[in-house]
Amino acid sequence: MNKLILLLSWFIISTSVSAQNETNLKGLETLAKQGDLSAQIELANAYRKGIGVTQDYKTAVKWFTLAAEQGNSDAQYNLGIMHSFGLGVVPNYQPAVKWYTLAAEQGDPLAQYNLGRLYYLGKGVPENLVYAHMWAKHASSNGFEMDAELAELLKELMTENQINEANRLEKEYEIKRYKTCFVNLLNE
């Protein structure tokens, strides 16, 4: 008898939770369609991970794209990953480079790392040790420790002129980022 009560309780609770998830999902979709960035990100992640919905990479790409077009670096990074690995899209490094670049320019260390790797490997962009090193250094300075090792390995493959050029580009990039941050603060 206790097992039957426990089973019925579990069924009632799971049905209630399922109905609540469906209601929450519909509410999120409504907000996302209205351009709500947080809802778009939450829906994209739900579809990417299969949380509360059936995993659907194509739908995740749709919602990440809408959020990325609003300038969200997390969505841009995720689109880079999805294009790199062919999740919901045909694998293609060129759009991956586009999305990684947009996120990397906003200071996303994982996007900077992946962008540096693509420049090193020449995938989606011409092989370029200078840019690979520059992005590896940025990722490292933004807390991604693996890129410090990559930057050092790249230095061994580079000429002194290439290292100097990478350092110059890195400084230019940092100045540009600081100026952008300052302008954004003034506009708030």
Residue ranges and their predicted role:
Residues 33-36, 49-51, 56, 64, ...:
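Short helix-capping/linker turns of helical repeat alpha-solenoids
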Residues 42-49, 78-85, 89, 114-121, ...:
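Hydrophobic face of amphipathic alpha-helices that form TPR/SEL1-like repeat modules
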Residues 145-188:
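Terminal, low-structured helical/coil segments at or just beyond the last alpha-helical repeat
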